[in-house]
Design a protein with these regions (language model features):
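A solvent-exposed interaction/effector surface
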Residues: 2-196
Length: 196
């Protein structure tokens, strides 16, 4: 009888310890997820910003991106896959094994030729002064220096599903047509938070 009682106490003690460890692990994951999904620090700042009826015209300075193409996937899945590939690049999968700070926004647009989606991370400005961006360790990633450009921007909040993004893009296209503004590139969605 004593042996059985002692065994039951030991089992309850182990269950209590496992429960406490589970709670601590969940708390750690919750904290980490909060940090990982919070807005990232550096973002490309527009040089000029003109508010219009329903959108904003902005001129952005030249900037460098790490980009990849995801083919054969739908909009949301393409963002996840592209984000994973680019996240490995900034996490050290490059010739310098260098970790690169995450910046905002993450860009996703349809390619003009060849189909698929181009996903791009804007790289921090300080890489320019330190010899440029490290070369990717994955052949699916390339580095591209983009010239200064004007962009028509329609800010929206919420999760950028393919349907919601398409709706916002259609509204922006109508507004630009109304104002006689022609576009030079296919539209892109710029997200300031991770895609999960």
């Amino acid at each position: 009888m004593r042996r059985r009682k002692k065994r039951n106490n030991t089992i309850w003690w182990l269950v209590g310890i496992l429960g406490l460890l589970t709670v601590l692990c969940l708390l750690a994951l919750w904290t980490a997820a909060g940090m990982a999904t919070s807005r990232v620090g550096e973002a490309v700042k527009p040089l000029v910003s003109i508010q219009r009826d329903g959108y904003i015209l902005r001129k952005y300075p030249a900037h460098t991106v790490a980009a990849t193409v995801v083919e054969g996937e739908r909009y949301t899945r393409a963002m996840f896959r592209g984000f994973e590939v680019l996240n490995r690049y900034i996490s050290g999968n490059n010739d310098q094994k260098k970790r690169i700070p995450m910046t905002a926004p993450v860009l996703q647009g349809m390619r003009e030729k060849g189909g698929g989606f181009e996903i791009a991370f804007i790289l921090p400005d300080d890489l320019e002064g330190s010899g440029g961006a490290p070369q990717p360790g994955d052949k699916r990633v390339w580095i591209d220096r983009r010239p200064p450009m004007f962009m028509a921007v329609r800010p929206f909040s919420g999760y950028a599903t393919s349907e919601y993004a398409a709706e916002q893009i259609a509204i922006l296209k109508d507004l630009l047509e109304r104002d006689g503004i022609q576009t030079a590139r296919p539209p892109a969605v710029a997200q300031f938070d991770p895609p999960w």
